[in-house]
Regions:
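Conserved SAM-binding loop
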Residues: 115
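Class I SAM-dependent methyltransferase "Motif I" SAM/SAH-binding loop
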Residues: 83-87
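Conserved beta-strand signature within the Rossmann-like core of class I S-adenosyl-L-methionine
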Residues: 184-191
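Conserved SAM/SAH-binding beta-strand->alpha-helix loop
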Residues: 108
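S-adenosyl-L-methionine
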Residues: 119-143
Length: 310
């Protein structure tokens, strides 16, 4: 591994413990000076010599609200990526903004293992990774006005009628995000699902000064999520937007509005299940039998940002 160049964002204290087996370096990275790719696009960051690897996994979140300076061993702004999947967008932000702390979460342990491995090998000590859903995280572990940004890319639309309640972007969730953000804090949303986006455009501006974005994010293409890469390759339109928390909305008013707004009961477009299959590495033809409305198992996807696909 000595041929790998040291990254400028080195951890303050190199990890002394022997890494677990799942952190094995790929043959591709060995041949390409520490650079890995996915669908031909480099994964953000460069794999360092083992002595510079970080420890970023959270086996369990502490009870109650997270003490951010204690968790990251420094005091800095916090960005949360809910449903981070295998970590591409979080890694890109962590590489580009070493002065910012990043927490990536997902309900699937397997994708968090991928994200953790990549962050560890790149020495990104400004990241932490945890297996937890978005609602639970914000409700139980994030203190009011303690986070600078909350990102959610490609939330899972859930196709069955009895799964509507699992959809992440809802008035309740948006109220929790609004409460968690510091004054001037930012929400970032992205999806390839037109009906989901139309719903977001109706409810998100109630809590945020929200604007649509037509162009890719500045971190593209390296910072593109796995879902975004696949959807774009299939010609799907990607819907993006961001906004600041409304300063004229207090907690009680936000709670009242959340209770009065419509739930995300839109009719999900099942044609996008073919993209879901590609995201899982399957052939779309294998999903033809799902025309009866059955969806894949809840959360069974490459990487839910909470209840999401990344």
């Amino acid at each position: 591994l000595n041929q790998f160049e040291s990254h400028s964002e080195q951890p303050s204290e190199p990890s002394a413990a022997k890494p677990p087996a799942f952190q094995k370096i790929s043959d591709e990275a060995l041949k390409n000076n520490g650079i890995e790719t996915e669908f031909g696009i480099p994964i953000p960051g460069r794999i360092l010599v083992e002595e510079l690897w970080a420890k970023t996994a959270l086996k369990k979140l502490p009870d109650g609200f997270i003490n951010w300076p204690e968790l990251f061993e420094r005091d800095a702004s916090v960005v949360i990526d809910i449903g981070c999947g295998n970590g591409r967008s979080t890694l890109a932000s962590a590489v580009d903004r070493p002065e910012v702390n990043h927490l990536g979460t997902d309900i699937l342990p397997v994708v968090i293992r991928y994200a953790t491995r990549r962050a560890n090998q790149r020495g990104l000590s400004n990241t932490r990774w945890a297996v937890i859903g978005g609602r639970e995280l914000l409700l139980k572990h994030v203190a009011p006005h303690s986070v600078a940004e909350i990102h959610c890319y490609h939330p899972q639309p859930y196709y069955r009628q009895d799964q509507v309640g699992l959809r992440l972007i809802s008035p309740e969730f948006l109220q929790l995000v609004h409460s968690a953000l510091i004054p001037g804090g930012r929400i970032v949303l992205q999806t390839d699902h037109p009906s989901y986006w139309n719903y977001m455009l109706k409810v998100v501006p109630v809590f945020f000064e929200f604007e649509e974005r037509s162009a890719p994010w500045p971190s593209a293409p390296k910072g593109m999520t796995r879902r975004e890469i696949i959807a774009a390759s299939q010609g799907l339109r990607i819907f993006r937007g961001e906004g600041m928390a409304r300063m004229d909305l207090n907690f009680e008013e936000a709670l009242r509005l959340a209770e009065s707004l419509p739930l995300p009961t839109f009719n999900a477009d099942r044609r996008l299940q073919a993209i879901d299959a590609l995201e899982r590495g399957e052939e779309p033809s294998r999903r033809k039998g799902n025309a009866n409305g059955r969806s894949r198992r809840p959360g069974h996807r490459r990487g839910g940002r909470g209840k999401s696909r990344k």
